[in-house]
Design a protein with these regions (language model features):
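Conserved ABC ATPase signature
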Residues: 55-59, 63
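ABC ATPase nucleotide-binding domains
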Residues: 159-184
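Catalytic Walker B motif of ABC-type/P-loop ATPase nucleotide-binding domains
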Residues: 80-83
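Conserved catalytic motifs of ABC-family nucleotide-binding domains
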Residues: 76
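Conserved ABC ATPase "signature" region
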Residues: 32-50
Length: 184
């Protein structure tokens, strides 16, 4: 199992190559030549082979997220957990990350668990998805099953409706009383 944290969590004192090599050195007894080959293959898979010598501070946000993804796949895990992988990414980087996660899932047979508020991106790659509200699963199914779900709270979440079962306004007392200083 591996995890891609929202922040990427790269080691700031190691270059990209060393960040990806770290789990291989910690959890295997592979010879250095094989570690080098493996790291270069993982960096090639995420499009960063040419950035191997760069430090995390020299990377864009999207490049840092891809470097962290290369580290997450270094040990060829069967399961990868993604914590908000698309947050704060520009549309191009988001598209690249969606493509990479989809390729990992389908081409390599890796199970990917993606926790995200980016509904269109997740539903475009998910075989099965859950919608959680107030610590409870309120809907589950394929992307099509969720899109066809008539539940008002599911519709509000999927369609980005501002007011509905989840209210826009935080509960408050009488507005006029608050304006006139008669409220709490």
């Amino acid at each position: 199992m591996s995890m891609l944290f929202q922040s990427g969590a790269l080691f700031t004192d190691m270059n990209v190559f060393e960040n990806v090599a770290f789990p291989l050195r910690e959890h295997t007894n592979l010879p250095e030549a094989l570690i080098r080959t493996t790291v270069m293959m993982k960096l090639e898979a995420v499009g960063l082979r040419g950035a191997a010598s760069l430090m995390p501070s020299e990377l864009s946000g999207g490049m840092a997220r891809r470097a962290a993804l290369a580290r997450a796949i270094a040990l060829d895990p069967e399961l990868i957990m993604f914590d908000e992988p698309f947050v704060g990414q520009d549309p191009i980087t988001m598209g690249v990350l969606v493509k990479l996660i989809d390729e990992l899932n389908h081409a390599l047979g890796v199970t990917c668990v993606v926790v995200s508020h980016d509904v269109p991106e997740v539903l475009s790659i998910a075989d099965y998805a859950y919608i959680v509200a107030e610590q409870k699963v309120i809907a589950q199914g394929s992307a099509q099953e969720l899109q066809d779900n008539p539940d008002r709270q599911v519709r509000q979440f999927l369609d980005g409706i501002a007011d509905g079962p989840v209210p826009f306004r935080f509960p408050a007392g009488d507005y006029q009383d608050d304006l006139l200083g008669r409220g709490n």
